[in-house]
Every structure is written in structure tokens, then in C-alpha cells.
Amino acid sequence: MGSGPIDPKELLKGLDSFLNRDGEVKSVDGISKIFSLMKEARKMVSRCTYLNILLQTRSPEILVKFIDVGGYKLLNNWLTYSKTTNNIPLLQQILLTLQHLPLTVDHLKQNNTAKLVKQLSKSSEDEELRKLASVLVSDWMAVIRSQSSTQPAEKDKKKRKDEGKSRTTLPERPLTEVKAETRAEEAPEKKREKPKSLRTTAPSHAKFRSTGLELETPSLVPVKKNASTVVVSDKYNLKPIPLKRQSNVAAPGDATPPAEKKYKPLNTTPNATKEIKVKIIPPQPMEGLGFLDALNSAPVPGIKIKKKKKVLSPTAAKPSPFEGKTSTEPSTAKPSSPEPAPPSEAMDADRPGTPVPPVEVPELMDTASLEPGALDAKPVESPGDPNQLTRKGRKRKSVTWPEEGKLREYFYFELDETERVNVNKIKDFGEAAKREILSDRHAFETARRLSHDNMEEKVPWVCPRPLVLPSPLVTPGSNSQERYIQAEREKGILQELFLNKESPHEPDPEPYEPIPPKLIPLDEECSMDETPYVETLEPGGSGGSPDGAGGSKLPPVLANLMGSMGAGKGPQGPGGGGINVQEILTSIMGSPNSHPSEELLKQPDYSDKIKQMLVPHGLLGPGPIANGFPPGGPGGPKGMQHFPPGPGGPMPGPHGGPGGPVGPRLLGPPPPPRGGDPFWDGPGDPMRGGPMRGGPGPGPGPYHRGRGGRGGNEPPPPPPPFRGARGGRSGGGPPNGRGGPGGGMVGGGGHRPHEGPGGGMGNSSGHRPHEGPGGGMGSGHRPHEGPGGSMGGGGGHRPHEGPGGGISGGSGHRPHEGPGGGMGAGGGHRPHEGPGGSMGGSGGHRPHEGPGHGGPHGHRPHDVPGHRGHDHRGPPPHEHRGHDGPGHGGGGHRGHDGGHSHGGDMSNRPVCRHFMMKGNCRYENNCAFYHPGVNGPPLP
């Protein structure tokens, strides 16, 4: 119309000649003119006006004329446009108009209007539009169902007329037509239900074969040759085969009941088109269970293979009811070839296939895929000449060859000579050299410019033109509600402060004092004299360095030694004066600047020199080789306990025997199995001899483990009662460490026990006990002895003995014993001996026994050091009773096993890697590995 706005009243005035008072179109000619005006309408007002005119028109002739002229296609265009632009009011008006028009199935096939309406009914956003589209779809479905029931009868009549012309040439034709007509008129519902029951009751191959034979037993009687084909065709519900067989059977005789039964599957399709679901749903059970049923029934595939030629045509014609006309055409071509009669029979086969297009229409409507071209062409082809069908079928199956001139094709392309040339190959060396010189110069300039970073302006700055922008049409945020929400929110919260500057300059410099970096020397020699290192000997006071000025750093070995000595009290010499540790260290180290500490440690005899100098001062006790004790032996540094504690709780002392671990269990730890553990019962030490199993010697002291006399497997006996008379039992004293008359006790390291008269005490190194008459003392010291007393000789010393006394001889010595006396075991042990007592022989020694002394029961010690004494099987372990008279032979103790003690000779063990790498070990004397020069001879 015009480009300006349209007034609907003016438009209606122009159309007044074609409309009556109610707005309805008067005549058929008027609707064609209105349609021509509708094609030119572009505005929504004019289109809605024309749609309302159509809604007011009631005459079906006028509406049909509008559809025939092309109004339905025009409405399709308007519907597509409004759907793409999502114009809801126009869509509603178009749907109302479509609902008002008398559309048929043929009209619906012309375009995709039905598809668009179906999509609107499912995916439209507007609820009213969705409801309107669904109502329109349901109305169209009702139209499709009603027309699908009426079309088969009309098309059958047309076919009968066409076939009636050829009745003269085909005498068999009237018989089949009469039978088909009578069957269609008698019972259409029965014919529709029977094939349905066949499909539903026999989903599997095996079942279907049995039921098919039961239902069609009379039909098998006249045709025995084709029994197998009958089963296959019935099973798949194939129509052309029964038709062909019926034509052969019906020629000799009239209509027989078997012939009628064979025809029943033929005409089920035209009658079944009234119910769409019956056609579409039944094949699903066959498809779903076909695989399992094929496994259950093996003979069916064999039948197919044998009768392949006969079964081929029905299988090709089988999908015709479901797929449409295209699949039936090749099947009809085969029966027409052998005889002149089959072309007419092919038309009979097409008769049930003609109503297929109406059946497909509702299916396409349901899936919103209505195609106008394919559905419209199929009903046109169905009444056509069968020769055209066969001709089309042959064209589809024919193989065409190209002409002679087109058999060969030539393709020409231009060859690029430089296509396969190696571009990396240097052709001209002079040019390559120039390029390399230029690249080097460029790289040099770039590096120089980047190093100095002198950037200069090469292009003068030109101020750009100011742009004059038009004022914005809409002020940003004019209708924003968020700014009010944020303003309300900021009223009740703290303001957010951002302290960073607005300018991108450098930040304010922070004041700080520059501190020179600390120089960490890589070589230790450089730092020897710069930073003095003070070695702290004791927590209370600091000991000076060896040179008096604190200039040198102690080696790790000496540092550990000084720390271990500083843990206990300061050692005292025999005269009671203190030992000057600084003098010892100065003599060991020599001048601090002469040799670095690392070089001193590398000397093989360095540790031996330290020991030789420290042993006479009493810092390390007896030497490791002199009496079999390790450095820091009984009462050594820190007085460490080197045996597993007993059940009653340990009380560390130099001897765990008499008066040793005091508690409820006074007898030390339980003995291990005879096999011995590798830690506490190691191999025999050649330097110290085998384990001693002697008489009533000392209990297990440091580095000793008491052993039982009965093989070591028996549990320890209950602690015996305390006896004070005549020395009591050598295994006990009172729990508080006080000895009775004649009793004795071995005091722990750092303890000073109170002793009664006649008692004896084995004292730890560095202590001087007060002894009463008859008292005795541990190794390494010369105690003051009363009459009848005895003393424990130090390593390499011969103690002075009183009458009736006994000594504990040092290692390698044969002590002289008085009459009735007893001798303590070697190695710094002092057994408690009363008059008439006995002795526990030292490991590997054969003691000299005086009169009245009884040797160990069953023990024959060896004279040569390094041998292991035999096991002593005497009274129970840790138990020997002191007798009053002489001649007592005690037993039941197992002495010190050689080669397994901590701090002893560990040369047969692996070397401690901590000691070798760092020069010291955190376990010190308790380490179970070999420290060369400390717990064994130095490495060669």
C-alpha cells in the first residue's frame, strides 16, 4: 500500500464494494480481488484487516476459492515471517484464520504450515499461542483420520474402473475382483484384527512357525510345494506372495475356503488405515525380539537361504505398508516380467498399498515433518500405468556407462620450476656474507641501544584533531535502580578507602639504613682467627680455650669429650686436686696455628694420644685395652647405663650385682634365650675372653648382663630375703642401699653408700668412699684400708692386701690372696667377699685360689685370654648363698661377655658413618657401631 501509516477505516472503505455489512466477502470474484490485494500488503495493520475479513466470511465456497487461488500459500508465507520475527499477535490471528479455513489433507501436504503449527504448539513461549496451535493440530488430525477412512474406498473404485477395461484380455481377473469386493464388504473389522493377532501372539520365530501352521492348515493342503514359502510369508506378513499363489490356485476351481483365507492378509492394509497405531506399532515386537528369537530358532535362516529366489520379491515388497510407494515399485517389477498375467496382479498388489500416503500423513504430523512434495506425488503415481512403474524401476536399477569421449579425462596444471628447489641451499656466498654482516650490525645496535636505553624521538608529536561527538541519545544509567540501591547500602557501611595514587609515578621512598652484607667465608681457615669460639665446659662456668685467649676451635671429638665431662662433677686426682683441663687440651692441640683441626683428626694415632693423656688423669678411667673396659667405663662420663633395666627399675651403678639395681627385683634383668641376642650377647672378644660363668662374683655391672646357670632360659627366681650375717647373700642388700653387719654394697656412680663394719664397696671412678674396717673399694683408686680389709686394684696395679682379705685383680694380673679370702673378678670388679668366701673368676683368667676357697662349680676357666669359658650349671641364676664356713663354692652368675659391650672393642662391627663423616656421634659411648680409636683400635 503506501509507505505512510495505514488507517484501517480507509482500507475498509476501499473494500466496501466487496464486503457486506458484517464485513463478509460477498462473492467468489471478490475474494480473488481481495487475495490480489493481500499479496501487496506489507504492513501489519493491513494484514490483520484482511485476516479479520476472512474470519467474518462464512461461505465455504468462497473460502475454498481463496485456498485454490493461493491464499493458503500466502498464509504460509505470513506465518513463516511472523514466526521468525516472533510477532505473537499476528501469529494468533493467522492461526485463527487457518482454523477457520476448510483445509484437507491435500492442502496440508502443499507446504510446511502444519509443521510450523506443530512447532508452535510445543516450543512457543506464549501460553495462549501454544494452546491455540495445539487445538489447531488436533483439529487437523481429526480431518486426517476422517479422510484416511474414506479415501481407500474411492481409490478402490477408480482402480476397479481402470482394471475393468482390461478384463477381456485377462480371464482370471474377474474372479479375483469379485473375491476382493465380497471380502471388503463382508467383515472389514475381522480382517483388521486377524493379522494383528498374528503379530502379537507370535513375536518369536519358533512360536510364529507353530501358530502359522495351526491357523493355516487347510491352506497348506492344496499347495504342498510352497509350504516353506507360506511359513515365511505369513511370518513377515507379506502380501504379494499370497496373491500370486491365489491366482494360480483360483484358475482351475471356483472360490474355495482356503483361497479366501489366503486373501485375508491382502486387504488388511486398506481397512487398517482407519487405525494408524495398528499399522505402526505391531512391527516393533518383531524388531525388538528378532535377535533373541533368531538365536532360539536356527532352522529359519536356513529356509531363507534355500528359498532365496522365491523369498526375494516378498521381502522387497514387505516394507511397502510402512515406507510408502517407493519400496513397492521394485517389487512389482519382478512379477510382471515372467507372464502377461502378473502385471494385473501387480495392480492388485498395489491396491493395498494405495492408502499408504494417508497413513503416513498423521505420522508426519506427529513428528512435525510434513513434506508436501513426496506425499503429494505418491497418490498421483498409484493409479498410473504399470508400465511406467516398471520403466522407472528399471531406470533405478540400470547401470549406465559414459560415452567413449567421456571415458578419459585430462587435467592440466602448470609446473613451477622453483617448486622443489631447496630454499636453504646457499647459492651465492657473497650475498650470504652480506646478509650475515647486516644481521650482526643490527644485533649490535640493538644490544647497544638496549644497554644504554637512550630513546630519542624520531617522529615529531602531532596533536590529533579533537573529535566532536554528538550528545548521547540516552543518558547512561538514567533509569538505573542499582545506583539507589548502592546509595542506600553505603549509608550503613564504612567507606572503602583506596590509598594508591592516581598518577603512575614511582612510589614514595621508604627510609631505611643500609647495612653492609655479612661475609660468609667459604674456607674455614679464614675464619679461625676472626671470630673466637668459646667452648662451654659446664653450665655454671665457661672453660677457656686451650691457648688461654680463646683463639682456636675445638675438634668435634674434644668438644664432645669436654661436654661429657662437664655434665658430671669435676674429676679429682688421687691427691684430691683438680685437673687443669686447659693444660691437657693445650698439650693435645699444640699451637693452634700449627695444624688445623681437620689435619689433626686425620692422623691415625690422634685419638690414641688423647686417651693416653686423659687416662692417667682419671678422666676416662682405665684404658680400653688395659683392663677390658671401654672409655667411660664404670662411673665414666655421664655414668651411662649399658644394660637393660630390670623389672624393678634401674638404679645405675658400676655394678648391677650386690646392691646394684635396687628395687623389688634385686636380681637384674631376666636372662635371654640360650641362643643369645646379637646386641647383648655378641661374639667372644679375643682381647677380653669369653663369657665368664663363675662363682659368687659380682652381679651384672656396667657392660655386663647377668646370666643364669641353667642355660639362661629359666625365669629369674623371686628375690631372696635379705641376710645380714657374715656378709649376707651376694645378691642383695637392703633396698635403701645400707649394708648390714658383714654385708657390703657396690655403690652406684656418684653415690656414697653408708657401710657398716666389715662391709666393702666397689666405688665408681672419681669417688673416694669412706670405708670402715674390712671395707674395700673399686678399681682405679687406692683406698684407705682397715685391718682385714681388701681393695679393688686398678688396672695394672697390685693392691695391698690385709690378712684374710681378698682383692679384685686387674685384667692380666694374678692377685695374691690371703687365707680364706676370695678373689673378685678381673676388669675392675670387686665381688663382695666374706671370710671363707669365694671368687668369680675374671673372663679368660684362671684365678689362684687360696685355702678354703671353692672354685666355680663346673667351671673350668681357660688360662689363655680370648677363650670362652664353659657354661656353669649351678644354682638358679642370680642366687648364691654365702656360707659361714670356708670352702663355699658359689655359682649361678654369668660374667661379662666379651665383644658386645658398648664402648668396648667394637672393631668387629661396622664403622659408624656419623663418626667418620662428622668426627663425632650423637650416641657417643652408647653407639653400637665401631668408632676407630674410641671403642676399638684406630684404623690402619
Curated annotation (Swiss-Prot):
Motif interval(s): PP1-binding motif: 394-423
Compartment(s) of residence: Nucleus; Chromosome
UniProt cross-references to InterPro entries, sorted A to Z: TFIIS/CRSP70_N_sub, TFIIS/LEDGF_dom_sf, TFIIS_N, Znf_CCCH, Znf_CCCH_sf
Biased composition (Pro residues): 644-655
Segments of skewed composition (Low complexity): 325-336, 676-690
GO CC terms of this entry: chromatin; nuclear body; nucleoplasm; nucleus; PTW/PP1 phosphatase complex
Biological process terms in GO annotation: negative regulation of cardiac muscle cell apoptotic process; negative regulation of mitotic DNA damage checkpoint; negative regulation of transcription elongation by RNA polymerase II; positive regulation of telomere maintenance; positive regulation of termination of RNA polymerase II transcription, poly(A)-coupled; positive regulation of transcription elongation by RNA polymerase II; protein import into nucleus; protein stabilization
Phosphothreonine PTM sites in chain numbering: 256
Region called Interaction with TOX4, residue ranges: 1-348
Basic and acidic residues bias (residue ranges): 153-166, 174-196, 861-886, 894-903
Post-translational events: Phosphorylated on Ser-398 by PKA within the region necessary for interaction with PPP1CA.
PANTHER family membership: SERINE/THREONINE-PROTEIN PHOSPHATASE 1 REGULATORY SUBUNIT 10-RELATED, SERINE_THREONINE-PROTEIN PHOSPHATASE 1 REGULATORY SUBUNIT 10
Subunit structure, as described in the record: Component of the PNUTS-PP1 complex (also named PTW/PP1 complex), composed of PPP1R10/PNUTS, TOX4, WDR82, and PPP1CA (or PPP1CB or PPP1CC).
Protein name as annotated: Serine/threonine-protein phosphatase 1 regulatory subunit 10
Lineage of origin: Eukaryota, Metazoa, Chordata, Craniata, Vertebrata
